[in-house]
């Protein structure tokens, strides 16, 4: 009975070590890459475009409404947020 208990304990210890060693976030270089990625605003860099029609964004810029968060995001190209 004791040998079975020892074998079960060793197998569970090996399983625990293998699971915790493969968790994301243990690699410092990868964590640093995530931090720099979060600091950037990739949604403006990847696709700098207007989500609203061109006429709407032109009117927003003409009326100086680019400071509104709604238009700052949806008319990013026209308002110069890229």
Curated annotation (Swiss-Prot):
Function: Probable toxin with unknown function. In contrast to similar toxins, this toxin does not inhibit voltage-gated potassium channels (tested at 100 nM). Does not show antimicrobial activities against bacteria and yeasts.
Molecular function GO terms recorded: toxin activity
Family that this chain belongs to: Belongs to the sea anemone type 1 potassium channel toxin family. Type 1b subfamily.
Record-annotated disulphide pairs: 48-82, 57-75, 66-79
Signal peptide coordinates: 1-21
Subcellular location(s) of the protein: Secreted; Nematocyst
UniProt-recorded name of the protein: U-actitoxin-Oulsp2
Record bears the keyword Coiled coil: no
Note: The 52-Leu-Pro-53 bond exists only in the trans-isomerization. Negative results: has no effect on hKv1.1/KCNA1, hKv1.2/KCNA2, hKv1.3/KCNA3, hKv11.1/KCNH2/ERG1, hKCa1.1/KCNMA1, hKCa3.1/KCNN4, and hNav1.4/SCN4A (when tested at 100 nM).
Location of the region described as Theoritically crucial for binding to potassium channels in the Swiss-Prot/TrEMBL record: 70-71
Major place of residence: secreted
Keywords annotated in UniProt: Cleavage on pair of basic residues, Disulfide bond, Nematocyst, Secreted, Signal, Toxin
Domain of life of the organism encoding this protein: Eukaryota
Organism: Oulactis sp.
ShKT domain span: 48-82
Any matching Pfam family: ShK
GO cellular component: extracellular region; nematocyst
Propeptide section residues: 22-46
Entry-linked InterPro entries: ShKT_dom
